A protein has these predicted regions:
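Non-transmembrane, aqueous-exposed alpha-helical and coiled segments at domain scale
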Residues: 31-162
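Short, Lys/Arg-enriched N-terminal segments with co-localized hydrophobic residues
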Residues: 8, 12-32
């Protein structure tokens, strides 16, 4: 998934950039780390996809940015890369509470990441390539393992005895 418009839409991209900048200044927008969705877009998401908290959509946009930065280049992101980026960002931000935070937003599996990505595609916020599918997000990892069993708990240091 990527946020860039194809070249043939270069002129509208400038107006989208201006609109995004204006939305940042607007009190009627929703934001998370630079990811912004204006109220009309968020309202459409709430109506069409009520199963996810509005913050989940912002988190997915932030995770897309996080994943692209980590890869070091702006390019198409696969479902697996996106799901892994979402996991890593959630662990980085929310630590041992990551699974609970995602659950509160309605995200309980990697497929939910895909559902949100494709909701954003449906509204024209993100674009997909021809071969992209919601199934690309199925079963990438188990939430219980990723957020609980394999959480990188810090091992306590042994007490030094005299």
């Amino acid at each position: 998934m990527r946020r860039r418009l194809p070249r043939r839409h270069a002129a509208p991209a400038r107006s989208l950039l201006a609109a995004a900048h204006a939305a940042l200044q607007s009190p009627e927008s929703h934001r998370m780390d630079g990811a912004v969705l204006a109220d009309p877009i968020m309202e459409r998401l709430r109506r069409r996809y009520p199963m996810y908290h509005e913050t989940a959509y912002l988190f997915i946009l932030a995770a897309l940015h996080f994943t692209i930065e980590r890869l070091g280049e702006a390019r198409h992101i696969t479902g697996r890369e996106m799901a892994t980026g979402c996991r890593d960002l959630a662990l980085e931000r929310y630590g041992p509470m990551a699974r609970s935070v995602l659950d509160y937003w309605g995200i309980r599996s990697t497929r939910d990441f895909g559902e949100i990505v494709f909701a954003l595609v449906d509204l024209g916020i993100l674009v997909k390539q021809e071969g992209d599918s919601l199934d690309d997000f199925d079963g990438i990892f188990c939430f219980a393992e990723a957020f609980e069993q394999n959480y990188p708990w810090a091992c306590p240091r042994p007490i030094e005895q005299d």
